[in-house]
Amino acid sequence: MKGKLLKGVLSLGVGLGALYSGTSAQAEASTNQNDTLKVMTHNVYMLSTNLYPNWGQTERADLFGAADYIKNQDVVILNEVFDNSASDRLLGNLKKEYPNQTAVLGRSSGSEWDKTLGNYSSSTPEDGGVAIVSKWPIAEKIQYVFAKGCGPDNLSNKGFVYTKIKKNDRFVHVIGTHLQAEDSMCGKTSPASVRTNQLKEIQDFIKNKNIPNNEYVLIGGDMNVNKINAENNNDSEYASMFKTLNASVPSYTGHTATWDATTNSIAKYNFPDSLAEYLDYIIASKDHANPSYIENKVLQPKSPQWTVTSWFKNIRIMITLIIIQVEATISMK
């Protein structure tokens, strides 16, 4: 997967009695904060410094932790928190704002999890790089490692993190994931087919969890499924993703991509000729409390610029952080 950071806005109209179908701004103005859940998904591109020592993982952990955009959410899904030291630093920086946190997916299978499911292995070289942080108590934490990946993804415990979060007297279920990357090293195995099977594993988990149908289930993170040029194609992988999860298709605003080499210097350095892609989402299960309005809004805050040295060359870094801040306006009454 190509590194990026994503923020979106999602507004969920309320369940049985009071569905709201206006704009997201109107929805936000019309509801009390106690009746609102705001969720963000954020790919921080913290690859291991053992392999990539010069991408400012520690510096970015401090920038992310201090940034205004990451504040005042209810829940934040973090992707690619692979580097142990940098991810520990980031989670520590977020602790004051988000005191309730999961461990990083696949890093261990200890008591920090209520359950470890799927294909977890302590001998896999890399963890799954997903964590969830919350302002509100997390009543249950489950990590699930996918059955299969291809290419370099086979060397990581990729999967998803499930959290049961209690805001006031209402439970909301948030799943954060990072699906199979598009990779030529997969050989004859189709990365898209691997992603489809991973989505089926998520859906099977949700069904087997027997979550009450009057509670919201949100699935978010780096899906590695490109929306661009696929929205009007019912046979596309993009359309298939929503069918497999039986999830609502959100509306989209803000920047038109969640990974864009024209706005992110690390992406440009690694993939200078690659086209922009829209790969990150937060969506809601239609098998449970179904929002009347969902919007994914992509914003682009910029980091300060700094210079690193790699192979005796100075590289100037200025990252435009592409973020999906998803605000879920739901009834908590």
UniProtKB/Swiss-Prot annotation:
Residues 1-26 form the signal peptide. One of its GO terms (biological process) is killing of cells of another organism. Its EC number is 3.1.4.12. Activated by cobalt and manganese ions. The keyword Membrane does not apply. Disulfide bonds join 150-186. The keyword Signal applies. This is Sphingomyelinase C. It is found in: Secreted. The lineage of its organism: Bacteria, Bacillati, Bacillota, Bacilli, Bacillales. It is an enzyme of class 3 (hydrolase). Required, with sphingomyelinase, to effect target cell lysis (hemolysis). It catalyses: a sphingomyelin + H2O = phosphocholine + an N-acylsphing-4-enine + H(+). PANTHER family: SPHINGOMYELINASE C 1, SPHINGOMYELINASE FAMILY MEMBER. GO terms for molecular function: sphingomyelin phosphodiesterase activity.
